[in-house]
Design a protein with these regions (language model features):
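N-terminal glycine-rich cofactor-binding segment
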Residues: 3-22, 39-71, 86, 107-118
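Glycine-rich beta-strand-centered segment in the early N-terminal region that forms part
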Residues: 21-35, 50-97, 136-138
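NAD(P)H dinucleotide-binding glycine-rich loop of Rossmann-like/cofactor-binding domains
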Residues: 54, 93-170
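Mid-domain Rossmann-like dinucleotide-binding core that forms the NAD(H)/NADP(H) cofactor-binding site
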Residues: 137-217
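Glycine-rich cofactor phosphate-binding loops and adjacent beta1-alpha1 units
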Residues: 160-163, 202-280, 321, 343-344
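Residues in the short beta-alpha loop(s) of Rossmann-like NAD(P)-binding domains
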Residues: 197, 262, 287
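C-terminal substrate-binding/catalytic core of Rossmann-like NAD(P)-dependent dehydrogenases/reductases
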Residues: 223, 227, 265-313, 321-322, ...
Length: 344
């Protein structure tokens, strides 16, 4: 079957032929309909330091998808051929302390679809039954294939109370923008979005941000809020500047959730900015399985167009490189690939 591959340890991805996966007794084979291109796929394409240290070619990439169950292993009971499904891309070991206490999203032995195991940028993908998610009929394919990034946003937002809160969002990439939509629908009192790029700030307005700023200026944020700073900070960028400025913009007793991944060491004034202010800080990794998925489904059933403005490019799968280049030059937010015509 045709697939998008990291065929060799170098810059780029290519179309190539790979075998259709065979499901084991507890696996589900899914005929892929739509996929989303993630920033992780871009890192693999660009073969940066992270990718070259983690990825072992040849590898089918991709982890955001929706499709139809084609076949199941003999022990599978929860789905059958013809069911419309997506899937959780973090495959926990099932045996460690985290997995056995409902925290498989932080399993130390996790395998990630399209990173550690063969991914979904192909006509077929195979996942354990325990990772499969039946998609509600009310949710369209283009949005259903984005449950992975939407789930990251949902997990970050729902890690603390947000109803009636004044929230600072640092970074308006796709996940930050999704978080703004969730905050708006979830009853946040004020959403202040920060991003250095004008087109992202415009999208933040579209998603419902009350105020958009080029940088997290302490005096500006404190003037906008009536509580001497934001109640909640969601850090989605991993930017050194954003983190250092953001901690100055929150009130004492604020909640801070960190999803963005820094690529350098960042000095924080821990005593003045964190300890004496009594902040509660949470690290966010992936989606809680499957609490976050239920929350995503509920939101998208009731707010069917919530993330529609963020899908800027819809392309056939064989034009994937066009989508990645659009992400690189900043013209794309979310790119959805159609696998309808892929050859098997």
């Amino acid at each position: 079957m045709q697939a998008i591959l990291k065929a060799k340890p170098a810059v780029g991805l290519e179309l190539g032929d790979v075998p259709v996966p065979t499901p084991g007794p507890r696996d589900v084979l899914v005929r892929v309909v739509k996929t989303g291109i993630c920033g992780t796929d871009r890192h693999i394409y660009e073969w940066d330091a992270w990718a070259s240290g983690r990825i072992k070619p040849p590898l089918v990439v991709g982890h955001e998808f929706v499709g139809i169950v084609e076949d199941t292993g003999v022990a599978v009971r929860s789905v059958r051929p013809g069911d419309r499904v997506s899937g959780e891309g973090h495959i926990g070991c099932g045996h460690c302390y985290a997995c056995r206490t409902g925290q498989s999203h932080i399993c130390d032995k996790v395998d990630i679809l399209g990173v550690d195991v063969q991914g979904c940028f192909a006509p077929y993908v195979c996942l354990p039954e325990s990772n499969i998610w039946k998609v509600d009929p009310a949710i369209c394919d283009d949005q259903a294939c984005l449950f992975d990034p939407f789930g990251n946003a949902m997990h970050t937002v729902m890690a603390q109370p947000i109803s009636g809160k004044q929230v600072l969002v640092l970074g308006c990439g796709p996940i930050g923008l999704m978080a703004i939509g969730i905050l708006r629908a979830g009853g946040a009192d004020m959403v202040i979005a920060v991003d250095p790029y004008p087109h992202r700030r415009e999208l933040a307005k579209t998603m419902g941000a009350d105020v958009v700023l080029e940088r997290a200026d302490e005096q500006t944020v404190k003037r906008l809020t009536d509580r001497d700073g934001a109640d909640v900070m969601l850090e989605m960028s991993g930017s050194k500047q954003a983190l250092q400025e953001g901690f100055r913009c929150v009130r004492s007793g604020a909640d801070v959730s960190l999803l963005g991944i820094p690529h350098e060491e960042i000095a924080i004034e821990w005593a003045e900015m964190v300890i004496f202010k009594g902040l509660t800080i949470r690290g966010i990794n992936g989606r809680r399985m499957f609490d976050t998925w239920y929350q995503c489904e509920s939101f998208l059933r009731r707010h069917r167009n919530l993330i529609e403005p963020l899908i800027t490019h819809r392309l056939p799968f064989d034009r994937f490189e066009e989508g990645i280049h659009a992400m690189q030059n900043g013209s794309a937010c979310k790119v959805v690939l159609d696998w309808t015509d892929a050859k098997v």
